[in-house]
Amino acid sequence: MPRILPVPLGTANTYIVSEGPASILIDAGFPRQGRKFFTTLSKQGMDPARISLIVITHVHYDHVGNLREIRDACRCPVAVPAGEADWLRRGAVVFPAGVHPVGRALIGAGRLLSRVLPGFVRF
């Protein structure tokens, strides 16, 4: 059974879904909250090195603000909805290299995410 760990960041939340040694981070919160994110993880006993994938549910400011800092620290790929990946690649939002559109490989994860974040995840 997956473990769901909320990572509260004030008015924005992120979540870590873990099963076995792998963990997926759902969303990255507001900008300039990287230190708070890593401090909160540490207090909850979570090693950020366990994060193997970051999934962005949608590219609103409060969901991608810390993405670069978290991704650089975790050194993992980022998945975004396919319909928003091209928009990001055109430079509308500064986004780290390694962003990949969400594809069929994540459909199973999408089913799990739709239970964790109902109303936001659409695959």
Regions found by a protein language model. Give the residues of each.
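Glycine-centered loop/turn positions within well-structured domains
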Residues: 15, 24, 62, 85-86
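Short, acidic/turn-prone active-site loops that include or flank metal/cofactor-
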Residues: 30, 83-86
